[in-house]
């Protein structure tokens, strides 16, 4: 009996799906102050979660500088 070798093909569809799932979409805040969560190391076997809640730090976004008109404009 002949043994036919199947040409090995990588499963591209499943890997593509996995890659898409692995990268989460970043929440984009429009015109709001972003909240950055500081990672707090919690001690083991502690039930009270209120005590060790992640610290929320609000950072003000830098405003883009508006282009100012040149004081000394060249006369055509």
Swiss-Prot record:
Keywords: Chromosome, Developmental protein, Differentiation, DNA-binding, Nucleosome core, Nucleus, Spermatogenesis. Residues 1-11 have a biased composition (Polar residues). GO terms for biological process: cell differentiation; spermatogenesis. Its main location: nucleus. GO terms for molecular function: DNA binding. Residues 16-34 have a biased composition (Basic residues). GO terms for cellular component: nucleosome; nucleus. It is found in: Nucleus; Chromosome. Residues 1-34, 56-76 are annotated as: Disordered. Involved in nuclear basic protein transition: histones are replaced by spermatid specific proteins which are themselves replaced by protamines in late spermatids. This is Spermatid nuclear transition protein 3. It comes from Sus scrofa (Pig). The lineage of its organism: Eukaryota, Metazoa, Chordata, Craniata, Vertebrata. The gene is TNP3.
């Amino acid at each position: 009996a002949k043994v036919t070798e199947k040409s090995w093909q990588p499963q591209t569809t499943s890997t593509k799906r996995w890659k898409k799932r692995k990268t989460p979409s970043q929440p984009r805040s429009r015109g709001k102050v972003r909240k950055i969560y500081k990672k707090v190391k919690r001690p083991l076997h502690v039930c009270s979660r209120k005590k060790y809640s992640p610290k929320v730090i609000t950072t003000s976004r830098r405003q883009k500088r508006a282009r100012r008109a040149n004081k000394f404009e060249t006369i055509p």
